[in-house]
Amino acid sequence: MEQTVMAGAEPFRMEGNETGILVSHGFTGTTQSVRPLGEALAAEGFTVAGPRLAGNGTAMEDHAKTGAPDWIRSIEEDLAWLEGRCSNVFFAGLSMGGMFSLYFAGVRPDLIKGIVP
């Protein structure tokens, strides 16, 4: 069944220079909470990705059916996008997004050059 994403909760990607920054929202949040940071970073020239974590920004029933493996996959898609165009990748996260910045710094130290949890 197709999920309807709330207006403003869509994932975002903004092309810039070779420094990429992934910004992740928190538990039950959406990209609305991190989009202003993403836009400010993009305005400074950075390449920015803001994934919508699976089950967020749709219906609570969708969120109830998702968990950490789903959210990790959501982030991995945007990390792969950044890795394909950036020589340095950083990760900033709000709340649970901050926890994921620590997680990915541990499992992908070859990719993540710094974090802002």
Q: Would you name each region that the model predicts?
A:
Residues 59-90:
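Catalytic nucleophile-loop/oxyanion-hole region of alpha/beta-hydrolase
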Residues 49, 89-90, 113:
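Conserved beta-strand positions in the Rossmann-like core of class I SAM-dependent methyltransferases
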Residues 3-59:
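Short, surface-exposed "cap/lid" segments of acyl-processing enzymes
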Residues 103-107:
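Active-site signature of alpha/beta-hydrolase-fold catalytic machinery across serine-
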Residues 110-117:
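A conserved short beta-strand
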Residues 93-97, 101:
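Gly/Ala-rich beta-loop-alpha elbow adjacent to hydrolase catalytic centers
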